[in-house]
Amino acid sequence: MIRHVVMWKLKEEAEGASRQKNANKLKLILEGLKTNIEEIKNVQVGININSDESDEGWDVVLISDFKTELDYTMYTRNEHHKKAMKFINAVIEERRFVDYKMDI
């Protein structure tokens, strides 16, 4: 099993919306990927509940699981993922990620 974890810091304002509105939209988009991309086995999306404006905090986190590395690769090449990435790239300041094999 492959776990894909991504954290984003969002711009204060982008695409005509506030950070919070874009975080909510991003959550809906990411959760919707599971419906359209069969390789995703599990997906969780969280919005940081800490309102502290600390530079150390991140706004949105994605945790998604894939059965194999090939499934993860197929996910990254899927048109729904590419469409989501267009929105993501328009609203983020920074991104950090880690992909790892889970022992199950």
Regions found by a protein language model. Give the residues of each.
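C-terminal structural segments of small proteins and small subunits
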Residues: 69-90, 94
